[in-house]
Amino acid sequence: MSDDLVVQRKEGLYCPAGDFYIDPWRPVDRAVITHAHGDHSRRGNAHYLAAAPAEGVLRTRLGEIDLQTLPYGVEIDHFGVRLSLHPAGHVLGSAQVRLEHEGRVWVASGDYYVAGSSADPGEDNPTCAPFEPVRCHCFITESTFGLPIYRWQPQAELFADIDEWWRDNAEAGRASLLLGYAFGKAQRILKGVDRSIGPIFVHGAVEPLNRAYRAAGVDLPETPVATEVKDKALFRRALIVAPPSAQGSTWTRRFGDYSDAFASGWMQLRGARRRRSVDRGFILSDHADWPGLQRAIAATGAERVIVTHGYEAVMVRWLGDQGWEAGAFATEYGGEDDELPGAVGAAATASEQAAEHVAESISDAEAARIVVAPDDLPVDDAGA
């Protein structure tokens, strides 16, 4: 529509009324950044605007940039567009972008995490502010895990499983190497595990981000870098957190006998676990699962929904069947694909090829069962 508040351009998602972009994938003059993952925040923009809690991680990842920050919920006016940022629950500093112009309200979600069908605050991501539904006329949503097979287990159960794996390894004198994305996933792991089991060490790519989290007030354990450990005997009871790129590298030889595991939402797929060639797969994601996506969308009260990266075809079809006006933007965002190089990424891609079949298989009964009333989510409905 010609009067849309956000349109798609070759540089990224563009707000014509405000003359700025949201998470552009090519360099632009003004970029509003939803969070510091590499597919949403790129180098080369002249000016950046992001939520205040994101400053440390953005500067850690992008270096010296012209960055303006905005506290959550504080509104600014830019060329007549009223703009504010609201928590997305994804990673430290993640934000949804609320735009209001001439009576219309749009919200661009970026990536977000909602705890499925549960209203238990214990299911929120404990390393950042929880997702805040914002009332709007149009909601631009991700769909990284937009298939019915993706349903996250309660966090207490998940971390009990991780702790049991680590404890069993420690009792056997074997190091525990847990692979997960260096920004967001690693800190979620460090926050959730039982620190009493043994020492915790990290890869050198993880610790700078840990420092940014601690500076923002997030309680994380002390995490010496593994390469600085002098007493190699400590590794026999240790948990070592590292990015996926460390798997099978010469860096791992220092640990001697070790068991490895991978933490990702993609571990829900048996093929991904097999192709990753790890001893264990833990299903841990910083994105909303299928029920979480439905719950978040319903809570906005939006009449129109535009789907971005992930399983767009499935989500658009499902939304249309439920009565929403639905469409999609073709973006260059990668979801968690950065965590799945090589054959594992191919496994996820192969599962996308089955999307149309999966969409056909969602019965009315299934749709009715997974739609959760949004009444249990606190909603910011200012201006909409």
Descriptions of predicted regions:
Residues 66-71, 197-204, 323-332:
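Short hydrophobic/aromatic-enriched beta-strand-loop microsegments
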Residues 59-61, 78-82, 117-119, 149-150, ...:
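Short, charged, surface-exposed secondary-structure boundary motifs
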Residues 91-99, 112, 116, 138-144, ...:
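Active-site-proximal loop/helix segment associated with metal-binding centers of metalloenzymes
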Residues 4-23, 215-238, 242-251:
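A short, well-structured beta->alpha microelement
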Residues 2-17, 21-26, 30, 36-177, ...:
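His/Asp/Glu-rich metal-coordinating catalytic cores
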Residues 41, 94, 116-117, 186-189, ...:
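Short, well-ordered alpha-helical microsegments
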Residues 159-241:
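Hard-cation-handling environments
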Residues 195, 226-384:
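C-terminal regulatory/interaction regions
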